[in-house]
Design a protein with these regions (language model features):
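Secondary-structure boundary/capping motif
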Residues: 42-45, 104-105, 133, 154-155
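A short acidic, often aromatic-flanked loop/helix-cap motif at beta-alpha or helix-coil junctions
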Residues: 78-83, 103-104, 151-154
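Short, glycine/charged-enriched secondary-structure capping and boundary segments
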Residues: 48-50, 109-113, 139-142, 160
């Protein structure tokens, strides 16, 4: 992940990101929410938070939240997520990521939605934090979704907002067909 100076860093996982993205994933019936982070200290934080809701008192205290957090699985890297999907489905996933820029392999939400509903392979959609993923990482994806545009020229959504908007476009109700 880049910071605002285009230096490679590792951003911190937040409790809000874990909870809010898990709830959004559950709402849109995402099978797994892979929380990918290379640092051991972040793995420990992720496992402590998810463990509380998956196995601890949180499971009893708030079963709805627990149901959402059950979809979260920590993994150290993208290759592990691809391998896990292949293990679960027997198929190599189509890899799609997001960015605020256009790339040669940028696709529309309509095309990505068709892959989800009509394709014969599972789809792994990755979201980054900070100021985007490294160039080498971006080049490894099959596709990059077109940016989310609002009515202004400001285009730097927090990851929780981007996930909610994009999952609604990919897996939400097709309201425009009504």
């Amino acid at each position: 992940i880049y910071n605002k100076h285009m230096k490679v860093i590792a951003t911190a996982v937040t409790n809000f990101d874990i909870h809010d993205i898990a709830r959004t994933a559950r709402t849109y019936d995402v099978k797994k929410y892979f929380l990918i982070h290379p640092l051991k200290v972040q793995e420990e934080i992720i496992k402590k938070i998810t463990g509380y809701w998956q196995h601890g008192f949180g499971r009893v205290y708030n079963p709805d939240r627990s149901e959402a957090l059950d979809r979260v699985q920590y993994l150290p890297d993208i290759a592990s997520a691809v391998a896990e999907i292949k293990k679960l489905t027997g198929k190599e996933p189509v890899t799609i990521t997001t960015d605020a820029r256009i790339y040669p392999n940028t696709i529309t939400y309509k095309a990505a939605r068709q892959m989800l509903y009509e394709g014969d392979r599972p789809v792994l959609v990755l979201f980054g934090t900070g100021f985007g993923m490294e160039k080498e990482t971006m080049a490894a994806f099959d596709y990059i979704l077109e940016p989310v545009y609002g009515p202004s020229n400001y285009n730097h959504l927090c990851v929780r907002s981007a996930v909610a908007i994009i999952l609604d476009r990919l897996a939400g109700e097709a309201w425009w067909e009504k």
